[in-house]
Amino acid sequence: MAQSADHVLDHLELFRGPEYQQMLADKKMFENPRDPAEVERIRAVTKTPEYREKNFAEALAVNPAKACQPLGAVFVSVGFEGTLPFVHGSQGCVAYYRSHLSRHFKEPSSCVSSSMTEDAAVFGGLNNMIDGLANSYNMYKPKMICSTTCMAEVIGDDLNAFIKTSKEKGSVRRSSTPFAHTPAFVGSHVTGYDNALKGILEHFWNGKAGTAPKLERKPNEAINIIGGFDGNTVGNLREIKRILALMGIKHTILADNSEVFDTPTDGEFRMYDGGTHVEDTANAIHAKATISMQQWCTEKTLPFVSEHGQDVVSFNYPVGVSATDDLLVALSRISGKEIPEQLARERGRLVDAIADSSAHIHGKKFAIYGDPDLCYGLAAFLLELGAEPTHVLSTNGNNVAGENATLFAGSPFGELPAYPGRDLWHMRSLLFTEPVDFLIGNTHGKYLERDTGTPLIRIGFPIFDRHHHHRFPVWGYQGGLNVLVKILDKIFDEIDKKTSVLGKTDYSFDIIR
């Protein structure tokens, strides 16, 4: 049926019409078509153990579950008050970072570039930097411009020298301009997060690139919190703030982007909403300790903080009872504050909920993919629930195998392999040769769900095809309850699907589960 003013079809229905189906069929004739039988034969081969062996033998990334460094750097930068991320690279690169963040958080994502093109990539982009910083400062009036790299790393542009030259030419006058080298062709968004955060702290603590004296640490009782690259940053950071407030702990959240990615619609446009105050960023050097919620997001930042005399503690995405216990014990030990009764009661509620639902989760097999801290945290929680994390895959988790070996050492399921440096094409082989009950990961897993029939539970980044997941915490006891409910809902949905045929399977299509 064609479009008409009386009956407007959206794309979900429009392209099913006969005229569009015929157009798509005709289009295939000009695309070097293959015999459908041969296509199905090859598909069948890719589902076999023999193909899996060849797949894992190849040093090839077909469908990596990671993004590039500058995305993580932009994510960090917007977590500071009045900060505009400035990527020394092309406009297309920045369009990718902005769209990626906007599609996940459903919020505008401010970021600019030096608009490098082919000539600047060959001969250097100094002039692009000078003009770009001047335009950014004059048009958007940021308190801080955080400069990172992308395409410029191919030729090796020196950001520090370029920024100094730009300041000498008057491009930037009053704004602080920290920087970090974040080449897009090595590492991942997690590496970029780490490099950018270290660069910002280094700027404020070590004398603003030689334009101010280095700060001298005067220890106080505050604690710094680093959230890491996190698709649930809005809900998680708010949950951590709530816990710290209940315990009466003075704190600073470094790179606090919980407001900029959840700005209210109230008639006032805010390009920069919330964020860690510039003064608090500098004063964070005086804190008693710094806690990283994600170890592998801060592999360079935490040693830098430690060099300045602070205690440093790291966790791996604290989901569930044991992980939250460890977090609260660490907070209590460092601060000297008691764990309040309210948190003890929340713990009891989570334990009660797990006990209520254990019969439905116990023994279920799960495959997990995503960032290394996320994979570790979810695997630990699944073991806590009595489930089996059969496959744990992290494209950007070089150390996840060793850490998971320690985690699984006491598992009733024995040694469960982890797959660092592997991608979603490897996961496809795993799901066909060693099937599981459920898959946990980001939006890109929906193609694995369609291909292998493994139901997908969406946790991680990015999640494009569902809305507002980022507003709810997955850390802490309350976050553990949210994850538990998400898992149970998918389990019950699958039970309903398999028991809904009248007269055949509906004997178990129950109201009560």
Swiss-Prot record:
Gene3D superfamilies associated with the record: Nitrogenase molybdenum iron protein domain, Nitrogenase Molybdenum-iron Protein, subunit B, domain 4
Protein name as catalogued: Nitrogenase molybdenum-iron protein beta chain
Keywords: ATP-binding, Iron, Iron-sulfur, Metal-binding, Nitrogen fixation, Nucleotide-binding, Oxidoreductase
Entry GO MF terms: ATP binding; iron-sulfur cluster binding; metal ion binding; nitrogenase activity
A Pfam family that the UniProt record links to this protein: Oxidored_nitro
CDD domains: Nitrogenase_MoFe_beta (cd01974)
Reaction equations catalysed: N2 + 8 reduced [2Fe-2S]-[ferredoxin] + 16 ATP + 16 H2O = H2 + 8 oxidized [2Fe-2S]-[ferredoxin] + 2 NH4(+) + 16 ADP + 16 phosphate + 6 H(+)
Function: This molybdenum-iron protein is part of the nitrogenase complex that catalyzes the key enzymatic reactions in nitrogen fixation.
Entry cofactors: [8Fe-7S] cluster
Cofactor: record remark: Binds 1 [8Fe-7S] cluster per heterodimer.
Residues binding [8Fe-7S] cluster, per UniProt: C68, C93, C150
Organism: Bradyrhizobium sp. (strain ANU 289)
GO cellular component assignments: molybdenum-iron nitrogenase complex
Family, similarity comment: Belongs to the NifD/NifK/NifE/NifN family.
PROSITE patterns: NITROGENASE_1_1, NITROGENASE_1_2
EC numbers for this chain: 1.18.6.1
Entries under InterPro entries matching the protein: ChlB/BchB/BchZ, Nase/OxRdtase_comp1, Nase_comp1_CS, Nase_Mo-Fe_CF_bsu, Nase_Mo-Fe_CF_bsu_N
GO annotation, biological process: nitrogen fixation
Subunit structure: Tetramer of two alpha and two beta chains. Forms complex with the iron protein (nitrogenase component 2).
